[in-house]
């Protein structure tokens, strides 16, 4: 971590004139009732940051930046991220020049380390066909092939044999109506059949109806029923 430097010189002396700095210092005094705009601070490029009262919300000030060179477009001005956080009210206190200088030194040190590492990697000679690794000469298919010995393969085979294999689920059994006995089909015959409504001699007739039911079940087994539309019922209105 880079320590916060102690300023022994003014880093913005060549960017902001002295009379303007005195004027901004006076504008930074906030205990004067007739002022509506207050100076807050500078960045290392000389841009000034201000606060002024919000007419729509008196309890919250508005924050703006005034570029040091108004002739340039706002896109050409590089605002430090610390001041961007302050402008967006994600930072309670504004950054100081010491903090900005410390962050600039950190970036310069990081760039110097990156340049040193890049120079170090450039000194390492590239691998040629003579000193290349064996893995580089192998194709991708050969590199992806597993390299197991015969003993390892035999051990894995024994492990797989000990693992219980789950049997495949049996398909749903569809009853074959032709192979079902007549008594089994008659069990499903409706109980409220002709036995309950017929008189003498109805038992033989009931048996005939049951046999017709058996033949019908055998013929219609597994066949979808045909759709027979019903006549619409006319409503009386």
Swiss-Prot record:
Record localization: Mitochondrion
Region of interest (Disordered), residue spans: 214-237
Composition bias, Basic and acidic residues: 214-223
Main location: mitochondrion
Keywords noted in UniProt: Chaperone, Mitochondrion
A Pfam entry, by short name: NDUFA12
Chain segments annotated as coiled-coil in the UniProt record: none
Cystines in this chain: none
Gene Ontology process terms (BP): mitochondrial respiratory chain complex I assembly
GO-annotated cellular components: mitochondrion; respiratory chain complex I
InterPro entries named among the record's database cross-references: ComplexI_NDUFA12, NDUFA12
Family listed: Belongs to the complex I NDUFA12 subunit family.
The protein's role, per its UniProt record: Acts as an assembly factor of mitochondrial complex I.
Protein name: NADH-ubiquinone oxidoreductase assembly factor N7BML
Lineage: Eukaryota, Fungi, Dikarya, Ascomycota, Saccharomycotina
Gene symbol of the encoding locus: N7BML
